[in-house]
C-alpha cells in the first residue's frame, strides 16, 4: 500500500540513526517535510547493498489469469471502474543476436486484483485497446512507452492518460528510474528479479511467473499513488 507520511520519522529525526531498510523512504519524507511543495525535495541514489537490505515484497492479492470469456468479462468490469491502473508487459527473452519477440503477456493492476492477459493464446486486442484508450483511467507503467510501442505491432490503439513513474522521478532529479530502484527508494521494499528472463511463451505459466508478473504491475500502480500522495505529479503532464 502507499506509504503514510505519518508513519515516517519526523524531519528532526537523524537519518543516520534509522534502520537501513527505512533510510530511502525516510530521506524522502524528512527532506519533503522541510520544504514547501516538492520543488525542494532532494532525492539520492540507492546502492545495490541498500536494496539488498530491504524486505522483499510480492503482490499478495487476487490474480486472475484471463483465459475464458467469463474471466475476460470479469476483468473488464473491474478495469472499467478503476481510476488508476498499473500496467506492464512480458516478452519471451531472446538469447540470439538479432532475434526478438513480441509481447506475450499484458498485466493490468487495479485496486482489487491483477489481471494477466496471455496475448499468444487469445485475442484480447479489443479489450486492451479499450483499456489503453480510456480517458478516465490513468495507466501507470515504468518504461511504458516501450511496452506500448511493442503492443502496437500486435494491434492498433491510441493510448490516453499514460504515465511513467520513472519519468516523474527523473523530473525530480533522480537518475535511477527502473522499477526495482523506484520501489526501493519510494516504497521501501525489494522486488526480486528471478523470473525476468523466464519463458513467458510457455504452455503454462508457473506460480513464480504469475507472482512476478502481477508484482510488477501492482508496483507500478503503487508508485503512481505514492507520487500522487506526495504531490510529485504537479509538474507532470499526462500523455
Per-range role (PLM):
Residues 29, 36-85, 165, 218, ...:
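N-terminal accessory regions of nucleic-acid-interacting proteins
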Residues 1, 8, 38-41:
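Short hydrophobic transmembrane-like helices used for membrane targeting/insertion
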Residues 6, 20, 32-36:
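Short, positively charged low-complexity motifs
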Residues 24:
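Cationic, low-complexity basic patches in intrinsically disordered or flexible, solvent-exposed regions
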Residues 84-92:
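Two-metal-ion RNase H-like nuclease active-site motif
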Residues 63-67, 80-84, 96-193, 197-212, ...:
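Conserved DEDDh/DEDDy metal-dependent 3′-5′ exonuclease domain
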Amino acid at each position: 500500500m502507499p506509504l503514510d507520511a505519518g508513519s515516517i520519522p519526523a524531519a528532526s529525526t537523524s537519518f543516520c540513526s534509522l534502520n537501513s531498510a527505512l533510510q530511502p523512504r525516510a530521506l524522502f519524507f524528512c527532506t519533503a517535510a522541510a520544504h514547501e511543495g516538492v520543488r525542494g525535495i532532494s532525492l539520492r541514489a540507492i546502492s545495490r547493498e541498500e536494496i539488498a537490505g530491504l524486505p522483499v515484497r510480492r503482490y499478495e492479492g487476487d490474480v486472475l489469469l484471463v483465459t475464458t470469456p467469463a474471466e475476460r468479462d470479469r476483468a473488464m468490469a473491474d478495469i472499467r471502474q478503476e481510476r488508476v491502473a498499473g500496467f506492464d508487459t512480458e516478452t519471451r527473452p531472446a538469447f540470439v543476436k538479432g532475434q526478438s519477440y513480441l509481447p506475450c503477456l499484458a498485466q493490468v493492476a487495479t485496486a482489487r486484483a491483477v489481471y494477466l492477459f496471455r496475448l499468444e493464446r487469445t485475442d484480447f486486442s479489443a479489450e486492451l485497446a479499450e483499456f489503453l484508450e480510456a480517458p478516465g483511467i490513468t495507466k501507470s507503467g515504468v518504461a511504458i512507452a516501450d511496452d506500448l510501442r511493442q503492443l502496437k505491432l500486435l494491434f492498433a490503439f491510441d493510448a490516453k492518460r499514460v504515465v511513467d513513474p520513472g519519468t516523474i522521478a527523473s523530473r525530480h532529479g533522480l537518475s535511477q528510474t527502473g522499477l526495482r530502484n523506484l520501489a526501493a527508494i519510494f516504497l521501501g521494499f525489494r522486488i526480486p528479479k528471478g523470473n525476468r528472463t523466464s519463458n513467458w511463451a510457455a504452455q503454462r505459466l508457473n506460480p513464480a511467473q504469475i507472482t512476478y508478473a502481477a508484482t510488477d504491475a501492482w508496483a507500478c500502480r503503487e508508485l503512481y499513488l505514492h507520487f500522487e500522495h506526495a504531490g510529485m505529479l504537479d509538474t507532470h503532464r499526462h500523455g
